[in-house]
């Protein structure tokens, strides 16, 4: 089986865990634990970091036989290619490329907020900007069932994850966008996803590491 290595948090790895489950991939997880404040000891990971044969040692990593990958989107795309969860047409590919990067942008904006010591002060302004972000996602999805088109692709796993994170921060943020709410329901209704969400393997939170200022436990 494949081995997925990451901190014992949701973090950047939720879409990867979801796609591994959806595709029925045989995998095991190596979840590294971080120590508590003030040191946040990382030795569980650091002791192995340079022993795994990774080109750019980092978390998450995926080891699949001779293939050893880092970078969360590279891992996600690798699994997607094995299972035809990539677009076929140029139009689908363009939409996937745009959305993959757009998701990373709004993910990083949320990460910057949540790891900021000024989280409480910055939160109000951040919340004000959420409707505009969601509106663009809603317009991009339009009447399509999935973000690239009529079939599920790896970017739906990314979009689901980031929309869900924003929903955790601001529970009403999707209320004005019925197509995004329907997308979430459609995704969570996929048989493999639904059963994974009910299993003990499912790790919906903490979103972030112990030194974040929100959703850190």
Swiss-Prot record:
Residues 89-207 form the GST C-terminal domain. InterPro entries: Glutathione-S-Trfase_C-like, Glutathione-S-Trfase_C_sf, Glutathione_S-Trfase_N, GST_C, GST_mu, GST_superfamily, Thioredoxin-like_sf. Residues 1-87 form the GST N-terminal domain. One of its GO terms (cellular component) is cytoplasm. Coiled coil: none annotated. It catalyses: RX + glutathione = an S-substituted glutathione + a halide anion + H(+); prostaglandin A2 + glutathione = prostaglandin A2-S-(R)-glutathione; prostaglandin J2 + glutathione = prostaglandin J2-S-(R)-glutathione; prostaglandin J2 + glutathione = prostaglandin J2-S-(S)-glutathione. It is found in: Cytoplasm. One of its GO terms (molecular function) is glutathione transferase activity. Its EC number is 2.5.1.18. The keyword Cytoplasm applies. Keywords: Cytoplasm, Lipid metabolism, Transferase. Signal peptide: none annotated. GO terms for biological process: glutathione derivative biosynthetic process; glutathione metabolic process; hepoxilin biosynthetic process; prostaglandin metabolic process. The keyword Transferase applies. Glutathione binds at residues 6-7, 45-49, 58-59, 71-72. Substrate binds at residue 115. It holds the Pfam family GST_N. SUPFAM superfamilies: GST C-terminal domain-like (SSF47616), Thioredoxin-like (SSF52833). Conjugation of reduced glutathione to a wide number of exogenous and endogenous hydrophobic electrophiles. Involved in the formation of glutathione conjugates of both prostaglandin A2 (PGA2) and prostaglandin J2 (PGJ2). Participates in the formation of novel hepoxilin regioisomers. Belongs to the GST superfamily. Mu family. Homodimer. This is Glutathione S-transferase B. It comes from Cavia porcellus (Guinea pig).
